[in-house]
């Protein structure tokens, strides 16, 4: 505020007075210069003096005008800021008035209303009259309610007539199987016992080996080695017929559960010469399915480097039996076997419930035994792959040297760079993949001018500069001996 008052009272009026004085001085200076130019003998000197007065007078007037204009602009800025402050204060006052009016209006509205007395009570109030509990009445289940619902109504009415009552029930109960599924002789080791609420099936002795599949004396000599005895005939799960000396349904039903079940097999024959290191007779006594599966997997994978994956029409042919029985070939639809479990004895759990019924249903559909193959079929279906080629003998130094002729041994050619790192020879053929690469044949001479950190070199070969892999060349110093 003081600055505004000083501008209005002092600076701006003084600027006006200075301009008026300059105006009067300019009039007097003009009269003097005119008289001096007329009366002076030296006109040039008088003209120069007139120019000097004119320049000084104009500069003085321009300075005074500039000072007065700055003072006026500063005055306008101060007044504009004061106007903004006044506007803000006026807006604040108007908002305060509006708030006061709203308070007064609410107070007046509150006067017109009546007070409501609320009594505080508990949120949960017990009912005054307790409801009597409804007695439960058991209603019999009507199984015929949904008989006329669904797409089978038309078929039933067309077949049995509209007057016949519809069938009650949707599941047909089949007759119990005539035989129980094979169970291990000792069931106390499992997690389910007789004293548990879930009843188990009675153990049944495993079936004996039929006489048709006994080991023949003609094939005893070629099946005494432990490696061939361990490779079992892995039967698919869809067949329940016996294979070789097993002759039981345990090969089909129990394979889906993975429970080891002992299978009695004939003792190994003593006729024929035994191979050195043959397994003793105790190894042929009992073999579980898990161990046989593990042995068949390991023997088939260790004989060759590749294992043929089972397909929809896989062929099992020419595998020796577990106990030295005859060889059989069977074409069947197979499923990929699960990974071989660890060869350890697990508690034998009897099969109960749905699994046992499914096993009996599968086992009750026997399949005819497969015919024996001719004697000239090999023992294993997958022959081992050919051995890898022998390694190259590098004892002779000439075998490892790339044969090349260096036409630039005496001196570098004209297209060779003046400054290069080393001179290398190509040990492989290389065809460029990009435009900035080199293409060369084995034995080409290349002058390296730069080595990159990524293994690529930059060099010159036959007047062409480009990049090439560093592992395709060798330093020429290695071959100068």
From Swiss-Prot:
Q: Give me the ranges of the annotated region Required for binding to WASF1.
A: 18-79
Tissue and organ expression note: Widely expressed with highest levels in bone marrow, spleen, brain, testes, and embryonic brain. In adult brain prominently expressed in the neocortex, hippocampus and dentate gyrus.
Q: What is its main location?
A: cytoplasm
Q: Which residues carry this modification: Phosphothreonine?
A: 174, 178, 215, 480
Q: Which residues form the SH3 domain?
A: 419-478
Which family is this sequence assigned to? Belongs to the ABI family.
Q: Name one GO molecular function term.
A: signaling adaptor activity
Which stretches are tagged as biased composition: Polar residues? 161-175, 222-235
Tell me which domain of life the UniProt entry assigns to the organism this sequence originates from: Eukaryota
**Subunit structure and binding partners:** Interacts with ENAH, Abelson murine leukemia virus V-ABL, ABL1, STX1A, SNAP25, VAMP2, and through its N-terminus with WASF1. Part of a complex consisting of ABI1, STX1A and SNAP25. Part of a complex consisting of ABI1, EPS8 and SOS1. Interacts with EPS8, SOS1, SOS2, GRB2, SPTA1, and the first SH3 domain of NCK1. Component of the WAVE2 complex composed of ABI1, CYFIP1/SRA1, NCKAP1/NAP1 (NCKAP1l/HEM1 in hematopoietic cells) and WASF2/WAVE2. Interacts (via SH3 domain) with SHANK2 and SHANK3, but not SHANK1; the interaction is direct.
Indicate the segments forming the t-SNARE coiled-coil homology domain, all copies.
45-107
Q: What Gene3D superfamilies does this protein's entry cite? A: 6.10.140.1620, SH3 Domains
Q: Where is this region: Disordered?
A: 158-285, 318-348, 361-392
Compartments (UniProt record): Cytoplasm; Nucleus; Cell projection, Lamellipodium; Cell projection, Filopodium
Domains (record comment): The t-SNARE coiled-coil homology domain is necessary and sufficient for interaction with STX1A.
GO CC annotation, single:
cytoskeleton
Q: Where is the composition biased (Low complexity)?
A: 248-258, 272-282
Q: Which GO terms describe its biological process?
A: dendrite morphogenesis; lamellipodium morphogenesis; megakaryocyte development; somitogenesis
Q: What is this protein called?
A: Abl interactor 1
In its UniProt entry, the species of origin is given as: Mus musculus
Query: Which sequence positions carry the modification called Phosphotyrosine?
Result: 53, 213, 428
Q: How is it modified after translation?
A: Phosphorylated on tyrosine residues after serum stimulation or induction by v-Abl. Seems to be phosphorylated at Tyr-53 by ABL1, required for nuclear but not for synaptic localization.
In the UniProt record, the gene name given for this protein reads Abi1
Residue positions where N-acetylalanine is found in the record:
2
**Biased composition, class Pro residues, residue ranges:** 366-376, 383-392
Q: Does the keyword tRNA processing apply?
A: no
Keywords associated with the record: Acetylation, Cell projection, Coiled coil, Cytoplasm, Cytoskeleton, Nucleus, Phosphoprotein, SH3 domain, Synapse
Give the protein's function. Answer: May act in negative regulation of cell growth and transformation by interacting with nonreceptor tyrosine kinases ABL1 and/or ABL2. In vitro, at least isoform 2 and isoform 4 suppress the transforming activity of Abelson murine leukemia virus (v-Abl) after overexpression in fibroblasts. May play a role in regulation EGF-induced Erk pathway activation. Involved in cytoskeletal reorganization and EGFR signaling. Together with EPS8 participates in transduction of signals from Ras to Rac.
């Amino acid at each position: 505020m003081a600055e505004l008052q000083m501008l209005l009272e002092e600076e701006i009026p003084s600027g006006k007075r200075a301009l008026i004085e300059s105006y009067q001085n300019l009039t007097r200076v003009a009269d003097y210069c005119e008289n001096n130019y007329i009366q002076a003998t030296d006109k040039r000197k008088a003209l120069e003096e007139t120019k000097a007065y004119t320049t000084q007078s104009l500069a003085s007037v321009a300075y005074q005008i500039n000072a007065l204009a700055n003072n006026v602009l500063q005055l306008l800025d101060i007044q504009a800021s004061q106007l903004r402050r006044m506007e803000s204060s006026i807006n604040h006052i108007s908002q305060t008035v509006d708030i006061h009016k709203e308070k007064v209006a609410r107070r007046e509205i509150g006067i017109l209303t009546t007070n409501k007395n609320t009594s505080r009570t508990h949120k949960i109030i017990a009912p005054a009259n307790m409801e009597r509990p409804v007695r439960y009445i058991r209603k019999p289940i009507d199984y015929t309610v949904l008989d006329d619902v669904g797409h089978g109504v038309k078929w039933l009415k067309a077949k049995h007539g509209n007057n016949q009552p519809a069938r009650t029930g949707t599941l047909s109960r089949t007759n119990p199987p005539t035989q129980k599924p094979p169970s291990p002789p000792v069931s106390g080791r499992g997690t389910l016992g007789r004293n548990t609420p879930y009843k188990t099936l009675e153990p049944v002795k495993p079936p004996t080996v039929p006489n048709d599949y006994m080991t023949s004396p003609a094939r005893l000599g070629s099946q005494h080695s432990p490696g061939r005895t361990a490779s079992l005939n892995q039967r698919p799960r869809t067949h329940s017929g016996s294979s070789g000396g097993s002759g039981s349904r345990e090969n089909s039903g129990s394979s889906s559960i993975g429970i080891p079940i002992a299978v009695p097999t004939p003792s190994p024959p003593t006729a024929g010469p035994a191979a050195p290191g043959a397994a003793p007779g105790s190894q042929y006594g009992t073999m579980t399915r898990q161990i046989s599966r593990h042995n068949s997997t390991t023997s088939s994978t260790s004989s060759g480097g590749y294992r043929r994956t089972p397909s929809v029409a896989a062929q099992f042919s020419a595998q020796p039996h577990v106990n030295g029985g005859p060889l059989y070939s069977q074409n069947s639809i197979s499923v990929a076997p699960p990974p071989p479990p660890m060869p350890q004895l697990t508690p034998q759990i009897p099969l109960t419930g749905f699994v046992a019924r499914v096993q009996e249903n599968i086992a009750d559909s026997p399949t005819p035994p497969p015919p024996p193959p001719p004697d000239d079929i090999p023992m294993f279906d997958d022959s081992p792959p050919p051995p890898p080629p022998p390694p190259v003998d590098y004892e002779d130094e000439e075998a490892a040297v790339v044969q090349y002729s260096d036409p630039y041994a005496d001196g570098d050619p004209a297209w060779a760079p003046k400054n290069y790192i080393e001179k290398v020879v190509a040990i492989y053929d290389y065809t460029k993949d990009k435009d900035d690469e080199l293409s060369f044949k084995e034995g080409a001479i290349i002058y390296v001018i730069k080595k990159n950190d990524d293994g690529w070199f930059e060099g010159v070969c036959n007047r062409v500069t480009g990049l090439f892999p560093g592992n395709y060349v060798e330093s020429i110093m290695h071959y100068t001996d």
